[in-house]
Amino acid sequence: MICYKCGQDAGWNDKCPVCGADLSLFKRAIRISNSYYNDGLQKAQVRNLSGAIISLRQSLKFYKYNIQARNLLGLIYYEMGEMVDALSEWVISANYQPDDNLAKKYIDQIHNNRNQLETINQTIKKYNQALTYCKQDSKDLAVIQLRKVLSLNPKLVKGHQLLALLYLEEGHLDKAKKALRDAGKIDTDNTTTLRYLKEVNRRLKEKGTERKKKNDDLISYQSGNETIIMPKRFRESSMWANILLSLIHI
């Protein structure tokens, strides 16, 4: 345990052997931090990544030197396609604990892979361009740009979500649903994904109801070799007119 006052290793004592600071409350904060870390780990194991991020951030609020929590947070960001955020957490982790730290391995793996570095740069550039197109109401161009982003970085959850939102606004409900399902495969309980999916399903249900109503308003019958389709109201009106004519001739 690192003493909050002098920054030295204090073991697990109630008082720092170096500066004499009272560490009893500090130890409690560390225990709470570890509890949040365990919760985040459990959520990550079932791919509730957004929920895991919330728990791990809480863990680091109570104890910023929780290296395991910070490294796991970086891994989750990486899994969600947020490579810059992942690197940021690992750099902080490596600064807090330079020795015997997996964060340094993660950083080296990315820095030694030029293709991955280029992917990171292109992802940022193209995603920001897609946002610019959205602000300019150039939705078609934004969709094209987002497809390029996701071909480079298929795990970028926010890319799938933005693409789904654009499809939703354009009425392409099946495409929107597919984009949201792709996002859900990465992060199962993301509230934004679930909210968008609920709206897509609502609109699909309305569309299905309208189609059924439209079909119910049509009737078809065979006339020789031809199938005649006409509005039901027209048929009913014609029948009523024929009845009136027959009454007149009586």
Where are these regions (language model features)?
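Alpha-helical tetratricopeptide repeat
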Residues: A29-A44, N71, T119-C134, Q161
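Helix-start (N-cap) detector for alpha-helical repeat units in TPR-like alpha-solenoids
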Residues: S33-N34, I67-Q68, N101-L102, T123, ...
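Conserved small/polar residues in nucleotide/adenosyl-binding loops
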Residues: I248-I250
